[in-house]
């Protein structure tokens, strides 16, 4: 429902009926998809564009994207290595005393916003005559990934977090 209606807010009954393993599997697979498919695809467009533009613009774009990629990798790694195992242990009635989902909430960054920043950098710094078709393609790719990451975040924030809060009691 969140993909078709981002305004959807699940009821308590919806949250109670959550299949945590299915959600964790979906989130984990989407992490792999972003890291192995979507980000490399955007990066391949960027490399072609960067090669054709003046070094000062190319270096700015390249540095920003590499920092973004590192942030996304760290974000997903934290979820995969800390948050998801914690949730699995809760589902198996094994409470982990040094962590709570509130810690995740307070540290949960909005990684899709930086893609909007990348789009703004491309618009601001990239000379208009460099690969106009490529610019359109990368813009569409960035918008698509931004939208998808936004839905991904909604699943975490509106479904997974409330579910875990219920389990924590």
Name what the model sees in each region:
Residues 1-169:
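Small-residue-biased structural context
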């Amino acid at each position: 429902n969140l993909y078709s209606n981002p305004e959807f807010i699940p009821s308590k009954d919806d949250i109670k009926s959550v299949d945590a393993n299915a959600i964790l599997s979906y989130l984990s697979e989407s992490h792999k998809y972003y890291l192995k498919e979507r980000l490399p695809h955007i990066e391949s467009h960027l490399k072609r564009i960067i090669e054709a533009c003046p070094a000062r613009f190319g270096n700015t774009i390249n540095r920003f994207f590499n920092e973004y990629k590192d942030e996304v990798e760290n974000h997903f790694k934290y979820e995969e290595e800390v948050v998801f195992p914690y949730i699995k242990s809760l589902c198996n009635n094994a409470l982990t005393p040094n962590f709570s989902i509130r810690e995740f909430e307070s540290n949960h960054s909005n990684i899709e916003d930086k893609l909007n920043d990348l789009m703004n950098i491309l618009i601001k710094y990239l000379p208009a005559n460099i690969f106009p078709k490529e610019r359109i393609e990368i813009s569409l790719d960035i918008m698509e990934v931004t939208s998808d990451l936004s839905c991904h975040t909604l699943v975490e924030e509106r479904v997974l977090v409330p579910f875990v809060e219920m389990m924590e009691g």
